[in-house]
Regions:
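Intrinsic disorder/low-complexity segments
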Residues: 1-3, 71
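Exported/periplasmic ABC-transporter solute-binding proteins
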Residues: 20-53, 57-67, 74-77, 81-90, ...
Length: 247
């Protein structure tokens, strides 16, 4: 019995020594699913994911300035490709972990119709979106307004947040009646939040393909390598789909 107990203690000590932290930069639109993935990742591997949220543009700037991130979960494909080309990401490590959906949402029932005609009516004071220079979902919102030939008409009503999370706050707090957001921000236990919504047709903007990249700092970090693998696992994929993303 003593030998068995000693063996179990040795195994536990070994597991504790192997467990590590991975520092993850995560695009703001992916905050909800990443919280769940981080919990499942720690439960299944023993490793802990320390998450920093922000707009993709700001995360890129932080990485360029030497921020100690091991992994980047971007809201686009271009930023990871740029970091890889600049030698800040591990060559060949990036891949698409999710494809997002842009929506127009208001907490007011009936304000947003199924075709987004409210944009042409102009019967609102403020329209929120993320800064297109910093956030891919903001760029998609801008492209949508350009596609509809409404940018010039509505530019005086636009309010921009640094990230898609701030754009959501503008709408949720009543500082804007409606806003362009990520579908994932509106799902609670698989159901849409109360209000009214238009899912923007995909042809109106560039695809919201979201890539993950192993950064140079994390290339020899067991926890970083484990997270890169875990994002492909069935538990992670199920969480991503449940939050409104395509794979």
């Amino acid at each position: 019995m003593k030998r068995i107990v000693s063996a179990l203690l040795a195994l536990a000590a070994g597991a504790a020594l192997q467990a590590a932290e991975v520092s993850v930069a995560v695009a703001a639109n992916f905050a909800g699913p990443m919280r769940e993935i981080a919990q499942a990742f720690e439960r299944d591997t023993g490793h802990k994911a320390v998450v920093a949220l922000g707009s993709t543009g700001k995360l890129y700037a932080q990485i360029k300035q030497g921020a100690p991130f091991d992994v980047l979960l971007s809201a686009d494909a271009q930023t990871p490709a740029r970091l890889e080309a600049e030698g800040l990401g591990v060559a060949g490590s990036r891949w698409t972990y999710a494809t997002g959906h842009l929506v127009l949402w208001s907490p007011h029932p009936g304000l947003v119709d199924a075709q987004g005609a409210v944009l042409r009516s102009g019967q609102f004071n403020r329209l929120a979106m993320a800064d297109p220079k910093l956030a891919p979902y903001g760029a998609a919102a801008l492209q949508t307004l350009q596609h509809l030939a409404l940018l010039k008409t509505l530019e005086g009503k636009l309010v921009q947040g640094d990230s898609i999370a701030q754009a959501y706050q503008f709408v949720a707090t009543g500082n804007a009646e409606l806003g362009f957001l990520a579908l994932s921000q509106l799902l609670v236990d698989g159901r849409l939040r109360a209000g009214s919504v238009w899912q923007v047709p995909a042809h109106m903007h560039a695809p919201l393909r979201q890539d993950v990249l192993l950064l140079v700092k994390g290339r020899q970090q067991p926890a970083a390598l484990a997270l890169m693998a875990y994002l492909r696992s069935e538990p992670a994929r199920s969480i991503i789909i449940r939050h409104g993303y395509a794979l």
